[in-house]
Each structure stands twice: as structure tokens, then as C-alpha cells.
Amino acid sequence: MHILLANDDGYLAPGLAVLHAALAPLGRITVIAPEQNHSGASNSLTLQRPLSIYEAREGVQKGFRFVNGTPTDCVHIALTGLLDEKPDLVVSGINQGQNMGEDVLYSGTVAAAIEGYLLGIPSIAFSQLHKGWEHLDAAARVARDIVERAIATPPVEPFLLNVNIPNLPFEHIKGYRATRLGKRHPSQPVIAQVNPRGDLNYWIGAAGDARDASEGTDFHATAEGYVSLTPLQLDLTHRSQLEALAQWLN
């Protein structure tokens, strides 16, 4: 078993190191991650400059490769040029903070898994609710269990899973739920600030609260103490509007 491991928090992130340690007994693990944090990078590729690959020489990250680019860059480089043979699975995470509802459109963590899926590899994105890396050991245990299940009996072929793990001690996690994406309210307005030079700058506002957290959603499952597993697809076609659009064109 060969697993390609990536993230969006950067190669020094605790979530990556803990996930690597949890998955290492399962087989060969290749790590390629961004040099710096790229949260919110979505599926962006770096096209305006060349990319470089480096290798960490010390610490728990020893042997990790890192790229001066985005999460999608990392997986794309690995699968189309760096690796001699394609891995059996792409795993992204563990992200610091949830990726639920519309978050998946912005998430670099999910984007890394999407790139693996686009290139024909089953892929899983793992995120832990809230920030601060509390109970990260529990999240890693959950991630390993899901990866082991996916290896032993793939749910479908190929698959793209978005997994969100409650920020709880392992013994307090109630189990797993297959979920759909919930929905958020619009994000908070941008925050305007004047810098010391008198220039007006803007910070992107916080994500909106859950708008659809009804039963069956990722928001509901995690709020109840369950791990949410959401199967994702990449076809954004609004099929129910096709006929109306065709009539409008005529």
C-alpha cells in the first residue's frame, strides 16, 4: 500500500505529522505538502512561475517533501512527475478547522484530495473541527480507521470523501455518519483597517454560521458528536435547469 499524503496548513503543521505517524504502519507513505500555509487556496495551480521541491532534513518532518506552491500544486506534481508509480490512495489533512458545507469550495485540504481524484486516485480529506489542535490524537485514530476500512473494502471506485472529525477525546466520539453537505449563511463582511502608512487594507471576514444544519448534514452529525463522511462529486451541472435554459435560448 502506497499513500500520498498532503495538506494545506503546510509541511510543519502538527496535523500532517500526526497523520503521517498514524498511517505509517499501513505501508509506504510519501509526503508532499506546501512550504507555507495555504488555507483557502481552493484548487488553484501556480502557473506564473516555476515550482521547487525541497526535503525536510530534521525533526518529525524529516523526509517530508515540500513545495513553494499550493496544495493542488503538490498533488499534481507528485502524480504527474515526481513519483515513479502512482499511489493507491491520496490523503489530505488533518486540517486545523472544519471543512463543511460551502467550505469545500474554498478549502485547500479538500482541493488536494480533489486533485488526486481528478487524476484517478481514490482520495480522502480529513479535517478536525475548531482550531488549536486539541484532541489531535483522537482525530488521527479516526483517520487511520477510515483509511484502513477504505483499503480493505473501498466504498465505491473511485471515491472522493470529505471527513470532518469532532474536536473530542476519542472515547467521546459516538461513531460515523454518512452525510450530505450542509449550508452556511453568507460570510461576515470584510474588515477594513488603516495601516501605519495611512493605506486602507481589508481582511476577509469570518465564515458564516450554519444555515442548514438539519439531520443528515455534516453540521448536524458533528454537532451530535459523530464523524461525518460526505461523498463528493465534481460535476457542478445544475441538471434540473437544463431544459429551462434550453427553452430560454430558443
UniProtKB/Swiss-Prot annotation:
The reaction(s) this protein catalyses: a ribonucleoside 5'-phosphate + H2O = a ribonucleoside + phosphate
Q: Which InterPro entries match?
A: SurE, SurE-like_Pase/nucleotidase, SurE-like_sf
* UniProt GO MF annotations: 3'-nucleotidase activity; 5'-nucleotidase activity; exopolyphosphatase activity; metal ion binding; nucleotide binding
Q: Which Pfam families is this protein grouped with?
A: SurE
Cofactor (UniProt): a divalent metal cation
Enzyme class at the top of the EC tree: hydrolase
| E.C. numbers | 3.1.3.5
Binding note for cofactor: Binds 1 divalent metal cation per subunit.
Q: What's a GO cellular component annotated to this UniProt protein?
A: cytoplasm
What is the first-listed, main subcellular location in coarse terms? cytoplasm
The entry's localization annotation reads:
Cytoplasm
Q: Where does a divalent metal cation bind?
A: 8-9, 39, 95
Keywords recorded for this protein, A-Z: Cytoplasm, Hydrolase, Metal-binding, Nucleotide-binding
Physiological role: Nucleotidase that shows phosphatase activity on nucleoside 5'-monophosphates.
NCBIfam families xrefs: PRK00346.1-3, PRK00346.1-4, surE
Family, per entry: Belongs to the SurE nucleotidase family.
HAMAP family found in the cross-reference section: SurE
Alphabetized PANTHER family for the sequence: 5'-NUCLEOTIDASE SURE (PTHR30457), 5'_3'-NUCLEOTIDASE SURE (PTHR30457:SF12)
Give the protein name, as stated in the record: 5'-nucleotidase SurE
